[in-house]
Each structure stands twice: as structure tokens, then as C-alpha cells.
Amino acid sequence: MHFQIDKTDSKARACTIKTAHSTIQTPVFMPVGTVGAVKALDATDLATFIKPEIILGNTYHLYIRPGDEVIKTMGKLHGFTKYPKSFLTDSGGFQAFSLSDNVKIDEGGITFRSHLDGSKHYFTPKKVIDIQNNLGSDIMMILDDLVALPATQERIKASIERTTRWAEESITYHRANQKKGIGVDQNIFAIIQGGTDKAFREKSAKELCRLDYDGFAIGGLSVGEANQDMYDTVEWTTQFMPEEKPRYLMGVGTPEDLVENVSRGVDMFDCVMPTRNARNGTLFTSFGKVNIKKAEYTTDAGPIDPECGCMVCQTYSRAYLRHLFRSREITYFRLATIHNLYYYLNLMKEMREAILEERFNDFKVTFYRKRGK
């Protein structure tokens, strides 16, 4: 991986990341393609209408079905999905916790049962790297010990200590594999934990950032805490993260979250919000959210967002989108997803341009003014 900082404007950063498959300009939002596809879209839709340089895949789901060995046989993720740009795959730990009953964690890893057939599985730090080697992703996330908030101080402390031990095991294993010719073009990120406790976040960041990782993520946020708590935690944590490596905030979030966390020095984001909300009838615009289910759009001939350059806004009316949604027409899911993802990626592009031109604060003021804030 090649990483360079192109420009900073206060704490906001415009950077360039080069992987084996694409050149990624930050700030970047990564559409979520959980099972190897962004829901309602195919690789042609992505290439034609969204044009992301990187998307996210889910290690847990791809391991459970169709299986990482199958995907390896089919040319890894790039050959299997025909998406030619970069993939980031998460470790699958979050899904192992959230989708499985009777999850057990020990010093070696996580025991869980498949949400599909109840079969028993064991994820270890080395196992999730082996799986991601088979998937062939450009950026791999390591296994970490997740903590659901609120949690006791003892539980958070134990989580940080275990995450550090697993991180040490993971980086040693990955670098040894690379010397054997395995995962040579794959990059690996560690995940900083600690809840919203500043002392724990500092401890986790300092312990992990001394290790030879290609980038670092802030995990364990956007799980129900107040927005300001998230922002404060990110602002506190980034000061302990190396400037010369990418910073990734996992599972975040709303357009406001993206703007606020870019202003605090974050480079990379992912979230299911634009795709999930699209399917549920919520569309994102420069002026806030549009609930396409509302009767007021029945005869509205205007686009979803008059400032949006996406194919949907250039072609179709709010009235038509509302009709498709109410009819449960599959075409609606595709069009709404294209619009929401275009909006998100264009927002990142606008932020990058503002940083490069040293007018990020003005951009932020305009962003909120359009929303009446």
C-alpha cells in the first residue's frame, strides 16, 4: 500500500491510498457489499453510476456462504464478483457476536454458531487472516474483542488487553505469510477499542499503533452512544494515531457523522445506512432526508435532489419513485440505492475538494445551513 497526505485543512485530511487494484482518494466512503454485492446493484451499476474505488465485504457471511475456499477457486473476490477495484473485508467478529446465540470468547478466539444452520465454528486471529487470504481482499481487518456498550470497566479493560494480544499474533502471522508469498499484495489494519472511555482509548491506540500495521481503525462506536460522545471519542483517539497511515472509522454513519469525523481527522468510512435507508424509503439530499412514502410526493415532478447529478435525479421524478416504492417494485430498490450511494460518494468528493482548497470550514457551514441547522 502506498499512502500519502495530499493536503490538510486544520485536522481534516485529503489523502491518496494506492492498493493493487485501485487508487483511492480520501475522505472515502466505502459502500457495503456484505455477501459480495452491494444490495440491489451489480458490478456494472457500481462502475457506471457510483464509481467507488473500494467497497466492503463481510468475512463472516462469505465464510458461512458460499465459503472462502469456493471464492478462492472462483478467482477470489475480484474474479467471483467481477468488481475490479479494491475490497476491504472486516474480520467477521462483529457478526459472530451479533448473529449467533451462545457466543463464547476465550484467549484463543470466538466460538459461535452459524445463523444459517446452527453449525459450530471457531474464529481465531490466524483463522480470519487465512479466510481473508482466500478472499483476496486488498485490506484485511484483524479479529478484535468487541464490547457492547454500556459495559463495565473490567470488561472494557479485558477487551483492550485481548485485542492487543490478538493484534500482536495477527501481524506476526501476516508478515510471516508474506515472506512465504501469501497475501503479498494484501494490507492489514488493526482496530482500536475502548468504548467512550478516554483512558482506555488512549491505552488501546498506543499499544496497537506501535505495531507494524498498514492502517488503523476506530471500532466500537456508532452502537447507540450519543453523537457527541462519538465525536469526542474520535477527536481524542486520532491524536494517538500515526499521521502517516490511514484512519478508518468503522460503521459510521449519517452525512452529518461523515462531515464531523472528517473534521476530526478520519479518512475512511463504511455504513449500511445509505443502502438500507434507500430500501426503506429514506433518500438523502443536500437539504436533508426525503421520506418518499409521504403523500405530498404523489404528483411531485421534481427530482429527489435538484442539486444531485446522479442518473436517478437526472431522469426520474419523486412521484415516480414514490409510485415504485408503494408498488414494491424491485426497480425502486435499484434506483434509490444508486441515488443514496451517489449522494454519499459525492459528499466525500466535495469534502476532499474543500480540503484541497483550504475552505473546509466554509463547506461545513454551508452543509449545515442547507439543512436549516
UniProtKB/Swiss-Prot annotation:
Its cofactor is Zn(2+). The active site is at D90 (proton acceptor), D270 (nucleophile). Residues 251-257, 275-279 are annotated as: RNA binding. GO terms for molecular function: metal ion binding; tRNA-guanosine(34) queuine transglycosylase activity. It catalyses: 7-aminomethyl-7-carbaguanine + guanosine(34) in tRNA = 7-aminomethyl-7-carbaguanosine(34) in tRNA + guanine. Zn(2+) binds at C308, C310, C313, H339. Pathway: tRNA modification; tRNA-queuosine biosynthesis. Substrate binds at D90, S91, G92, G93, F94, D144, Q193, G220. GO terms for biological process: queuosine biosynthetic process; tRNA-guanine transglycosylation. GO terms for cellular component: cytosol. Keywords: Glycosyltransferase, Metal-binding, Queuosine biosynthesis, Transferase, tRNA processing, Zinc. Binds 1 zinc ion per subunit. Its EC number is 2.4.2.29. Catalyzes the base-exchange of a guanine (G) residue with the queuine precursor 7-aminomethyl-7-deazaguanine (PreQ1) at position 34 (anticodon wobble position) in tRNAs with GU(N) anticodons (tRNA-Asp, -Asn, -His and -Tyr). Catalysis occurs through a double-displacement mechanism. The nucleophile active site attacks the C1' of nucleotide 34 to detach the guanine base from the RNA, forming a covalent enzyme-RNA intermediate. The proton acceptor active site deprotonates the incoming PreQ1, allowing a nucleophilic attack on the C1' of the ribose to form the product. Homodimer. Within each dimer, one monomer is responsible for RNA recognition and catalysis, while the other monomer binds to the replacement base PreQ1. Belongs to the queuine tRNA-ribosyltransferase family. PANTHER family: QUEUINE TRNA-RIBOSYLTRANSFERASE CATALYTIC SUBUNIT 1. This is Queuine tRNA-ribosyltransferase. It comes from Sulfurovum sp. (strain NBC37-1). The lineage of its organism: Bacteria, Pseudomonadati, Campylobacterota, Epsilonproteobacteria, Campylobacterales.
